[in-house]
């Protein structure tokens, strides 16, 4: 046999052996996640903003599962606190003012005529929602922006504002009809009953 064939067979045998060992190890030493952490993480807004004091939503979910307060997430607001309270069967408490205030869903807006193209906001964005290049105008992809507010601080010319997120069909806020405000309003059946008496 040729030396090349022997080398190929030897390497194939090694690859097969290492593959089997790695496959066995992945099954034997598999780490199961905590299902309550997954449920808590699913309720958090996934802005990865760090306003809660943790580097992202997953670490905060782990902290909540270990007994930390549920009211440290300003982007989630009261709705998230209520959902977490229902899940964990604890009392819903108001948002902790130390971590900010709930402002509803917001997105970053770059005043493009003032942008100097420094790329500091791009580097700060945890979800790559800002487009631009060095010495070029930057802009925000609204559908990707989580409203974490991390791009505002590093901007040297203060050309980034946080504005309310535009509403679409999925999150449209419809006004409920208001009842008529008249004292002593009578409906037709009441009026007819009163006449018959």
From Swiss-Prot:
Domain 4Fe-4S ferredoxin-type: 106-135, 136-165
Gene3D superfamilies in the cross-refs: 3.30.70.20, Electron transport complex subunit B, putative Fe-S cluster
GO biological process: electron transport chain
Documented EC number(s): 7.-.-.-
Top-rank taxon: Bacteria
Main localization, broad class: membrane
Keywords (A to Z) from UniProt: 4Fe-4S, Cell inner membrane, Cell membrane, Electron transport, Iron, Iron-sulfur, Membrane, Metal-binding, Repeat, Translocase, Transport
Cofactor: record remark: Binds 3 [4Fe-4S] clusters.
InterPro entries: 4Fe-4S_dom (IPR007202), 4Fe4S_Fe-S-bd (IPR017896), 4Fe4S_Fe_S_CS (IPR017900), Elect_transpt_cplx_RnfB/RsxB (IPR010207), RnfB/RsxB_Proteobac (IPR016463), RnfB_subfamily (IPR050294)
Listed GO CC annotations: plasma membrane
GO molecular function, one term: 4 iron, 4 sulfur cluster binding
Protein residues bound to [4Fe-4S] cluster 1: 49, 52, 57, 73
SUPFAM superfamilies attached to this UniProt entry: 4Fe-4S ferredoxins
Region of interest called Hydrophobic, as start-end residue ranges on this chain: 1-26
Residue ranges annotated for the 4Fe-4S domain, each copy included: 32-90
Residues engaged in binding [4Fe-4S] cluster 3: 125, 145, 148, 151
Amino-acid positions noted as binding [4Fe-4S] cluster 2 in the UniProt annotation, renumbered to this chain: 115, 118, 121, 155
Subcellular location: Cell inner membrane
Cofactor: [4Fe-4S] cluster
Subunit structure: The complex is composed of six subunits: RnfA, RnfB, RnfC, RnfD, RnfE and RnfG.
Function text: Part of a membrane-bound complex that couples electron transfer with translocation of ions across the membrane.
Protein family membership: Belongs to the 4Fe4S bacterial-type ferredoxin family. RnfB subfamily.
PANTHER family: ION-TRANSLOCATING OXIDOREDUCTASE COMPLEX SUBUNIT B, OXIDOREDUCTASE
Name this polypeptide is given: Ion-translocating oxidoreductase complex subunit B
Origin species: Hahella chejuensis (strain KCTC 2396)
């Amino acid at each position: 046999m040729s030396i090349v064939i022997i080398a190929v067979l030897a390497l194939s045998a090694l690859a097969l052996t290492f593959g089997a060992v790695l496959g066995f190890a992945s099954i034997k030493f598999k780490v199961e996640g905590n299902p309550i952490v997954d449920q808590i993480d699913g309720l958090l807004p996934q802005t990865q903003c760090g306003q809660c004091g943790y580097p992202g939503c997953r670490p905060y979910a782990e902290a909540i599962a270990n007994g930390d307060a549920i009211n440290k997430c300003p982007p989630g607001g009261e709705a998230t606190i209520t959902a977490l309270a229902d899940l964990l069967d604890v009392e819903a408490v108001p948002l902790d003012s130390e971590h900010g205030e709930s402002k509803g869903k917001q997105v970053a807006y770059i005043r493009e005529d003032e942008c100097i193209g420094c790329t500091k906001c791009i580097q700060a964005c945890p979800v790559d929602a800002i487009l631009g290049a060095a010495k070029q105008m930057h802009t925000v992809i609204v559908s990707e922006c989580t409203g974490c507010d991390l791009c505002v601080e590093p901007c040297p010319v203060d050309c980034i504002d946080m504005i309310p997120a535009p509403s679409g069909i999925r999150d449209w806020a419809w006004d409920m009809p208001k009842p008529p405000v008249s004292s002593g309003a009578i409906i037709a059946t009441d009026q007819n009953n009163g006449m018959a008496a």
